[in-house]
Amino acid sequence: MDNTSLLTRGGEIYSRKKGKKQRLEEIVFDKEKRKEYLTGFHKRKVERRKHAQVQLEQQKREERLALRKSLREQRKRELAERLAFSKELNSSLENDEESSQQEDSSSKSDSEEESSMEPKTTEYDEDDKHVTVEIVEDDDDEEIAYPKEGFVTPRISPPPDVPLRPHKPKNAAKKKFRYESKFERTQDRRKEKIRRLKKKIRR
């Protein structure tokens, strides 16, 4: 080996190593995947749209479930309120019935006492006439104890009830039609239900 080859040997090794480092790897494309990517823009767009629709339907379903749950809870609350209200009405009606029974019993005892009282008789003597008057105290028209013998004043029947024609106002101002809000409609419905419940309970 001569001196020049020894001195230039390092340069050759360096150039070989440098060539290995700077050598670029070959890029190889998968033809099928490349073709699918380049021709599948519409397909991917449709898939994205379908995915968005599925998500939207799922969101709507969750909203419907939440709404049903809130409506169920609201109905339960309204039912509890109605039950409490009907219990109060029943208790008040029972109290009214008890008080009316007590009043009836007291009025019956009063009427019995009055009926036990003897009628007052007074006699009037004049020149040619002798008149006997019997006074009976009773509030009930149906239970008046008329004497069997003697004169009885005839009972005058009341005039028949003739329905009068209602007078219509000549210039009745028409009420303006106005749409009610949702809150007003719910309030009106509740009032109507309470009114019906009261009527049912009274029957």
From Swiss-Prot:
Superkingdom assignment: Eukaryota
Keyword Kinase assigned: no
Record InterPro entries: Nucleolar_protein_12 (IPR019186)
Protein localization: Nucleus, Nucleolus
Biased composition (Acidic residues): 135-144
Stretches of the chain forming a coiled coil according to its record: 42-98
UniProt keyword list: Coiled coil, Nucleus, Ribosome biogenesis, rRNA processing
Any one cellular-component term (Gene Ontology): cytoplasm
Broad class of the protein's primary localization: nucleus
GO molecular function list: exonuclease activity; rRNA binding
Family stated for the protein in its record: Belongs to the RRP17 family.
Biological role stated in the UniProt entry: Involved in ribosomal RNA processing.
Protein name: Ribosomal RNA-processing protein 17
Source organism (scientific name): Schizosaccharomyces pombe (strain 972 / ATCC 24843) (Fission yeast)
Recorded name of the encoding gene: rrp17
